[in-house]
Structures are given as C-alpha cells and as structure tokens.
Swiss-Prot record:
Pfam family, one: ATP19
Name this protein carries in UniProt: ATP synthase subunit K, mitochondrial
GO cellular component term of the entry, any: proton-transporting ATP synthase complex
Biological function: Mitochondrial membrane ATP synthase (F(1)F(0) ATP synthase or Complex V) produces ATP from ADP in the presence of a proton gradient across the membrane which is generated by electron transport complexes of the respiratory chain. F-type ATP synthases consist of two structural domains, F(1) - containing the extramembraneous catalytic core, and F(0) - containing the membrane proton channel, linked together by a central stalk and a peripheral stalk.
Keywords from the named record: ATP synthesis, CF(0), Hydrogen ion transport, Ion transport, Membrane, Mitochondrion, Mitochondrion inner membrane, Transmembrane, Transmembrane helix, Transport
Subcellular localization, as worded in the UniProt entry: Mitochondrion inner membrane
Organism expressing this protein natively: Pichia angusta (Yeast)
Family: Belongs to the ATP19 family.
GO biological process, one term: proton motive force-driven ATP synthesis
Transmembrane stretches, start-end: 14-30
Amino acid sequence: AGAYTLFGKAIPPHHLAIATIGTVVALVAPKPWSPKVKLEPKIDASSPEEEKFIKEYLEKHL
C-alpha cells in the first residue's frame, strides 16, 4: 500500500486519517473549561421600573 511523504518521512494513510479526525474533534468539541456565556439578551429599558417589569415577566413566562 502507498504511503504519503511528508517532510521526508513516509506516513501511512490511516495515520493521516486519525490525525485529521482528532483535529476536527478537538476544534469542534465543547470546551468544559471555557467560561460559560450567559445567553440572555440585553434589556434596553427606559426606566428602572420598566427593566424590573421585563425581568419579572421573563422569569414568569420562560
């Protein structure tokens, strides 16, 4: 079976496949040590009362 030559060394195709899959998984997998991003939209209220009302409404209905 043929091997690829990289940097003057013969690399078997299955090693390249394993390296490719490992790289893709490492880049795509979620990182448990990364800081958690809170998925909450910014409340742009015109007054503190309105902001309080919006927060209470969201807590009640979501």
